């Protein structure tokens, strides 16, 4: 029997040949964790109190920062935000008043530099001058200090524009670390170094890094069993909250009928939820993850309507309907678009109602504008496709940082992350502040590096790599290197935004925007992790959302 929503006898439609989802409704609804219940919560609370005592104990600043770094990498820092904030502020203020800490070793100074910058303190790159010779080069004797080299390498990724000392530090440390793993004197340390060289800590998706680091920490000499037990219990407890989030969003998705009726589109609910875990993992942000998953799923379907299925006339009608944000605009839409538009309209209006009820702000104008801007950017790319136009890289990026959908994701995230809504932030939000633009750029570049080959094979528009090749005549390898360079340059701008100077946005929102960039590099590191489910993405889903850590 032919589906009336999908049938069309006169129009030839393209197909991306996306595979059906590997995580079905029944599988998600069956997810169950044994790491829930009063006994687990009591044990976690007891261990948390023990850690608070450790944090409040008098110890050297270097030991305090080692503990904070371990807590962050084990995914536990969110429990101790006030204590960590107090310690970091105290150490920063003491550093401003004396230079005794400059007598520390390279590892300690680099670790403190990284953590202070991570927490928004603009500590000078010149603290590394004591490790440089009169010509400005890092001293050759540092080659033997692998732990110091690793810390220096990780610290260098928090650089901002114009910080040449950190550029030189990165090259020096990377060269040393690459030589070390060839010798492989210490298997565990070599594994940690290789992991860092593949993707630096500052660019990694936090929750996936936590899962990896828990296994590493267990093998480390001097490991604290208390911290390890808490990390495992907490990871499994948080995973159990994800199960409840997933059951909610899979029921919502099934009720929309979009996965069933619009078979040309990617049905990727589990992957869309994984994005939200990458962006904001703590358990208390369940509402954030649930609504963000709806947003991500709607974006995925609408993207496929513009990229694959819709005709140019239909796409113009859909764009107009979203701009009007009026259910009466549905009358002119074909049947398959009516279903999508109504799901979009109802889901976003429901979120706006929650914001009006809870905070007294009418946010539909901001949400509507973000969706309209997205659809208009999709329409630009559709027109380019139909006339066979290849833009310059700059012309492409002027549109593509919006069409990658990060502005829509982050505008919604602002209203979901729980901080008070302010008029100053709303004014900035309308024009898409720098933190949104820079996060969007990295998502676009990472997506293009991971997906452009597959998309070109099925006849899609040229992406940033192809635009740069067309414009300059360089090889694909050189073009990819250029896009990687642009990712690095954009990270410098994000790092500047993370100083929170005169920002109308909360630290939570800026962290969410940063994490979106991190999640992009995770999802597209080995290809199209969003469209193709059965590679690295499947492993990520299993390790973060399905399989608990053995105790």
UniProtKB/Swiss-Prot annotation:
It comes from the Eukaryota. InterPro entries: Isoprenoid_synthase_dom_sf (IPR008949), Terpene_cyclase-like_1_C (IPR034741), Terpene_cyclase_plant_C1 (IPR044814), Terpene_synth_N (IPR001906), Terpene_synth_N_sf (IPR036965), Terpene_synthase-like (IPR050148), Terpene_synthase_metal-bd (IPR005630), Terpenoid_cyclase/PrenylTrfase (IPR008930). Coiled coil: none annotated. Mg(2+) 1 binds at residues 303, 307. Disulfide bonds: none annotated. Binds 3 Mg(2+) ions per subunit. This is Terpene synthase 10. It comes from Ricinus communis (Castor bean).
